[in-house]
């Protein structure tokens, strides 16, 4: 159940005890005193919200707040900050690295899925989208309310916040750009619990940083998108697959996997040969469910590349190809050690002879095995230094921290 009851005041001594149990009591008491709904440990709602998408890395939050308003988010951020607990928003919860849980144990998780309103202003074409909305809901509401759309990814259950704040690649991206390219503003709760609007005209540095590295900087509670006319024609098709019903349902909830990603320019003949040889060698020898997805990301006719590289923190507009590497096993299985080296080998063989500056990685297809320094460089490239300065300005004590987040220019020790 979601609880709002006021707990008894804790003693000053209990506030400094570092055990997870006492931390939870402190945080829950703070949330309750501020009238912020939260999940009771052991309740069905805790089990639902606290179940990770990637069961290989099952991180456990110290507490789960369930905000319904921006004011709830403000109060929850204050509870975490004042009690030394990192704060992490979770929208759809589909981060491959479980970053919505914090990417590690012990965070105050903000479950945003009760904040899902979508409103279209037909006079301006501007859509207001709450951060807990899923992509399918956003798409259907924009079309229903005015025949409008934004560019976004293909999975309807993915949360809009994490998707938009780090890129938002999908089938429409080649002609319409990334989801973040349609963002014109956002309402953001900062580490000091203040609420600001970020746009080109207001808090422009923060707005630039949100578009590519948003989860490192604050909690966006509301987005403002320009929209375009949805296509008037669509192709209908029917595919009948021989699926096991229960396994199909389970597959939408959780998976057990390791993933990685890559951006590159056009591959040389030697690199193509190396990629294909690895596929037919190591790949064919691995008798389980793995796949590689290669998307035409950039190029001279791409709407992604047409937008200036300095328009946002998204760092890899110039890259032609975007790859996703994915290896999974049954939910109940122990993920095998050879899976890590297998996917890393795929990346290494694809980038044979390639300079570090000629490649990158996509935060929305994260590789959780990367160290923080390497991850920052691979995700944000030449934009990292500016991002670190902005991080230092808005969150110097890293209230919003996870193992691959942007660090401030002068980071503190954890």
Give residue ranges: language-model regions:
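Soluble FAD-dependent oxygen oxidases
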Residues: 2-10, 14-414
């Amino acid at each position: 159940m979601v609880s709002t009851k006021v707990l008894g005041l804790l003693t000053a001594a209990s506030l400094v005890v570092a055990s997870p149990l006492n931390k939870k009591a402190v945080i829950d008491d703070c949330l309750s005193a501020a009238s912020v709904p939260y999940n009771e440990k052991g309740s069905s709602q805790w089990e639902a919200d606290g179940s990770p998408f990637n069961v290989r890395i099952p991180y456990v939050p110290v507490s789960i707040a369930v905000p319904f308003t921006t004011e709830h988010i403000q109060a929850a951020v204050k509870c975490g900050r004042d009690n030394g607990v990192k704060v992490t928003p979770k929208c759809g919860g589909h981060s491959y690295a479980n970053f919505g849980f914090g990417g590690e144990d012990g965070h105050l998780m903000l479950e945003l899925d009760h904040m899902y309103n979508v409103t279209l202003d037909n006079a301006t074409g501007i859509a207001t989208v709450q951060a807990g909305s899923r992509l399918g809901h956003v798409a259907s509401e924009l079309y229903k309310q005015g025949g409008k759309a934004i560019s976004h990814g293909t999975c309807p259950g993915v949360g809009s916040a994490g998707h938009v704040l780090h890129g938002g690649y999908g089938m429409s991206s080649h002609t319409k750009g990334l989801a973040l390219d349609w963002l014109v503003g956002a309402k953001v709760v900062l580490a000091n619990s203040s609420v600001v609007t970020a746009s080109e005209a207001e808090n422009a540095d923060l707005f630039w940083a949100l578009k590519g590295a948003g989860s490192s900087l604050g909690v966006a509670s509301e987005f403002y998108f320009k929209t375009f006319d949805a296509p008037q024609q669509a192709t209908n098709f029917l595919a009948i697959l021989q699926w096991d019903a229960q396994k199909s349902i389970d597959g939408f909830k959780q998976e057990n996997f390791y993933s990685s990603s890559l951006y590159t320019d056009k591959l040389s003949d030697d690199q193509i040969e190396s990629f294909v040889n690895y596929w037919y060698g190591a790949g064919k020898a691995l008798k389980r469910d793995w796949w590689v997805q290669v998307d035409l990301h950039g190029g001279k006719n791409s709407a992604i590349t047409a937008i200036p590289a300095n328009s946002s923190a998204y760092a890899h507009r110039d890259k032609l190809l975007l790859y996703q590497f994915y290896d999974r096993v049954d939910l109940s299985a122990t993920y095998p050690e050879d899976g890590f080296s297998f996917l890393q080998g795929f990346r290494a063989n694809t980038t044979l002879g390639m300079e570090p500056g000629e490649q990158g990685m996509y935060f929305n297809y994260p590789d959780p095995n990367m160290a923080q320094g390497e991850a920052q460089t691979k995700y944000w490239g030449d934009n990292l230094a500016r991002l670190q300065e902005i991080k230092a300005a808005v969150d110097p004590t890293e209230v919003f921290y996870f193992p691959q987040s942007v660090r401030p220019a002068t980071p503190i020790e954890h």
